[in-house]
C-alpha cells in the first residue's frame, strides 16, 4: 500500500514503525543519550528510536527539542525517518539538522508499531509493503442535530453486527462523492440529501488491511429510512453518544472529521 504524503526533509529510509497515538516532545520524551522512549503516552516506553520509522501526530514542546533530535541523529540513536499528521517547526528543524527524512499529512491513526515501512520524502510517499489498501466512502447523514447509524447484517463481508454509518467500496477511478450518494440511496432509500461537508481521508485499520475512508456529511430533511439487506437496524443519535456503541474502526474519528473539516 502506498500513502501520499508531503515531503518535509528530503531523503529515503526503510524500517519498522514505532507509532505513538499522542503528540510527542523530544524534551523529556526520549532519553537523549540512548534514544529510548520515556513518555508513557506513546505506548512505547523503553522502545528505542534507532532504525525505526517514528510516526506520531505532531510535535510539541520547546525549541530545545530540535537540538535533542539533532543530537540523537548525530550519535546514531535517532529514528530512520519521521512521519507526522502535521509537521511541527521544532521537529522539522531537528530533522533537518540531523538529516532525518520527514513527511507529514499522513493519518498516523491507521499505522501500527512494527509495520514495515518505506518513507520517500522526495517523492512524498509512505509505503507499507505488507498492507492492503481499500478505498471506501462513509456518509454521515444528519437530521435536526442527530446522525444516522446502522447495524451491519450477518450477510456482509466485514464487521458483521457492528454499528456504522452508510458506507461502500469505491470502484476503480470512481468519484467518491458519487459513490457516497449511490450508497445512501441504496442503503436508506433517502434521495433528498444535501452535501454539507467533506474531510481528508481517515485510515481505518483491520489487521493487514487499511481502509482509506473518504468522509462526507449530508443533511436529510426527514428520518424515513428504508434499510436494504446490508443493515438490520438503525438509530438517530447525537454525535456525542457514538462512543456508547460497538462500531467499525475509527467511526468516531470519521464523524469528528466531517464536523471539523481540515483547512
Which role does the model predict for each range below?
Residues 2-11, 17-127:
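Feature captures the catalytic cores and cofactor-binding loops of soluble hydro-lyases/lyases
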Residues 252-263:
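Charged phosphate-binding loop/patch that engages nucleotide di/tri-phosphates or the phosphate backbone
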Residues 77, 189-190, 247:
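Helix N-cap/coil-helix junction residues
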Residues 143-145, 201-225, 235, 239-240, ...:
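Active-site-adjacent beta-strand/loop module that shapes the phosphate/pyrophosphate-binding cleft
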